[in-house]
Amino acid sequence: MIGLVLAAGAGRRLRPYTDTLPKALVPVIEREGEEPTTVLDLTLGNFAHVGLKDVAVVVGYRREAVVERKAALERKYGVTLHLIENDKAEEWNNAYSLWCARDVLKEGVILANGDTVHPVSVEETLLATRGRGQRITLALDTVKQLAEEEMKVVSTPGEGVRRITKQMDPAEATGEYIGVTLIEGDAAADLADALQATFERDPQLYYEDGYQEYVNRGGRVDTAAIGDVRWVEIDNHDDLAKAREIACQY
């Protein structure tokens, strides 16, 4: 099993940082005399902690910034990075971005969005579900009060995920998908097919829409509750301020 980070996104609501950086390299922790700690740093640290020393990173927007930091990140976290090119990062949404990584899915991955700041307990929770026959397992926040913007999930005991979408009454949801998934290698081919059907239908769809397509085709997606932990998806400067507050507590 390897780590996988989707780091191709532009993050235009985080300008001026993202004028020159992909969202995954926006500074989260800054200390005088040290290189800033980014979302990618935090994720690589988590992966290394749970023994995932091979990490694929899907790059696109400002890919050169990741290339420039690659060797230093490998040294710092003791990992080997494999960069995967998303040639449509500024045109299409992330269903295509995850599909670009279809070959590494065969190895089994923990997938992390390049804008999600979360503690290593999330990876540990997902890895603890292995051996139960689950092919795809989503990290789910069942504690947070949900609103309209969140990626909401309806999951049924014994059946797994029935719906995953932002377009849902929060009161109907089991919880929020936080942007971290364990994908076993035997799900790779079916998931890749579902992702391809998703972006071919509409290139602006999310990879979570690909998960829904996978479920609609009869595939099972399970969830793992992460407990009462602090995490944040960084979409804008308010989110970044929250990330800077909580990342120092990990």
Predicted regions and their residues:
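Conserved core of the sugar-phosphate nucleotidyltransferase
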Residues: 119-198
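Conserved N-terminal catalytic core of the sugar/cofactor nucleotidyltransferase
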Residues: 2-5, 13-16, 32-108, 201
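Active-site glycine-centered loops adjacent to acidic/histidine catalytic or metal-binding residues
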Residues: 9, 115, 236
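Conserved alpha/beta core of the MobA/IspD/sugar-nucleotide pyrophosphorylase nucleotidyltransferase superfamily
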Residues: 1-3, 174-250
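Conserved beta-strand segments of alpha/beta enzyme cores
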Residues: 24, 80-82, 160, 220-222
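A conserved hydrophobic helix/loop-capping motif in glycosyltransferases and polysaccharide synthases
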Residues: 4-8, 27-28
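A structural signal for short hydrophobic beta-strand segments in well-ordered beta-sheet cores
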Residues: 25, 153-155, 223
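Conserved beta-loop-beta/alpha segment of the NTase-like Rossmann-fold superfamily
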Residues: 67, 74-151, 155
